[in-house]
Amino acid sequence: MRLVVLTAVAAALAICADAPKADLTLQDGAGKKVRLRDLRGKPLVLNFWATWCGPCKAEMPMLVELEKQYGARGVQFIGASMDEAKTRAQIPTFLAEHHVAFPVWYGASADDLDRLHLGGAVPATAFLDAEGHIVARILGQARPEELKERLDWLTGDRSGPAPDPLVKHLQ
């Protein structure tokens, strides 16, 4: 039994090592190009959201609180706004109202969600390891325990079983 478990863990690690690294190029609030690959070296939470999205509004306070807790443990949080030109002006107000202190990138699209296998709707959250591999995804509004379980695993020694790599709250 122990050999089976060790073999399964080794296979999962080998697959992860061969998996392509996630990449995304957007703009920061000042219009400067920003790239996901430039943040490799520490675990990262990438949350796709929009100002017009009700579940995103409900989820954002959780992310803000978790960033305070896990940012101190080396986890980088990035918000990727799906707002288009007509709603983009609302982003600074949204960020101020929700006390968002982590970086927010502008110009995310449905193509970005698709390329990262995050479905076709927001909110959507990807958890990346320090090498840039997506190790977990939550499609739809995340629950606090789902976020914490993945963050604890990502920042821990990973000796226990990994959390479910996909949580899907959307149909």
Residue ranges: model-predicted function:
Residues A14-D38, F102:
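N-terminal "domain-start" segment that seeds a small globular fold
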